[in-house]
């Protein structure tokens, strides 16, 4: 899942960009942005996205390139209003990314709710036993999909035999 997230973020972020994410996202995602992208001048701010007033204030003040959310979140299982956040985020020009790993596409379709990109850790819900590694990036934006595919091709972050 993290390789999929990494390919997406490399496709959209540039030095000086800002990522706003929930304060309870998966630790690996937080670590990826803070410790891998941080040295390349990518700023990260975390807030309680379940409180729309706090989220709105942060989005309007920071004007991030990416709003990253999980619903339900991992590990606290907090629920976030994807539609409301997407509306606010799009008003300030942010790309809305939803980690939909816990909900799965069966229970929630974030693209229908207004998200721009959906990511899944297929390690968790397809493998389930950490014996298969994988991730998915889904978007309706053909240009963005092409940029992510290039990152995956160029960096080799795709599933394949060893």
Predicted regions and their residues:
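Conserved PLP-enzyme active-site core in the AAT-like
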Residues: 1-162
